[in-house]
């Protein structure tokens, strides 16, 4: 079987959002013999920031010497992005081999009316591939929620809920507490704590749902006064001229057991991912990585003589962590793809994510802002627009997805919020070209509202010079991109 045929089989499965998938994924995983079940897993849930946190955790662990599998969603451009080993996407021939292996089983399930959903199959493929590649540890990003998510078929050694906000309410519940409780289901078994960056009602609901928690966030003087002081402190000192963030992380002595820093740790780092929320995600990732190291070495204080042969090469200290954070790249999250005009791609897809984007952008100098906005149909569009940065012009658009929102409806939301120059677009590439044409060299073009919109813009820019790790090195002669023909 060729890759293209295998991809069609996978994309032909049910892709509806929020379908309970844990039992279906477990059924398929069992059919495969539960490959990878012996691996130490890190499980990352949350309304926002779970993908960034998963990537940061993976980067720290790789810097420490582990071979790491990373499972994330959605993909921006190619399905193979969702499953990576040591930074490399799953090989196309492996995708073909997996689909060929399960195709008879899929046919049986389809005949019985119990065919798995797309995300079930992708989750099983990730675990199958990680087992084939003989990795040391796997980091899994939850799809939706936690309790019934397909990724919940594994038993993690470390878990986190990055944040809690109103998102996927049709599946997870209408309140912050409902959503937090669903996400807290990723808590590791036994006496290991669940790490969380949630605040307010979300944090309190997680506290009641999990046996033990470790809280992460900004210091109380900078945080919501209703919140207690976090156990682990993350500070964000703003962006540099090079468009990376300055952060510091402080882990007090004794705040967390079963981790490689029981004596405490404080360090500074640069971060390619901008924003105070990313500083918090970096601190969560550091905590998760420390739990993994302690698990694999067998002791939080294991010295070189105590380590087994399989962990002898592991190196974990503040310098290693800072290098892992500094080198992590995560496309589509405040990703700067040009400087003249400043062009930023950010997949913020709910009000809380737009709030974080607005705060981050406020520290970046530019003149006028030109927004390219598209979203899914089930999102709070008016609230997202209200939370967006002050905007001089907007072009709405529709990504190539059945559940994308109507651009005309999005335009009405923009007009109702008081934005004067609003253009109803359709195709993402045309909308992006229009915004770029409007922008002067000292302006900003911001693409946001959905990772699917961001993914289409990244595909449009693929003809430009793009490094293998997702960094972009500018456009020839500083020209604005033109939409590709289809």
Residue ranges and their predicted role:
Residues 17, 22-37, 63-154, 170-173, ...:
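ATP-dependent carboxylate-amine ligase catalytic core
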Residues 201-205, 209, 342-343, 382-444:
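C-terminal helical cap/extension that packs against the catalytic core
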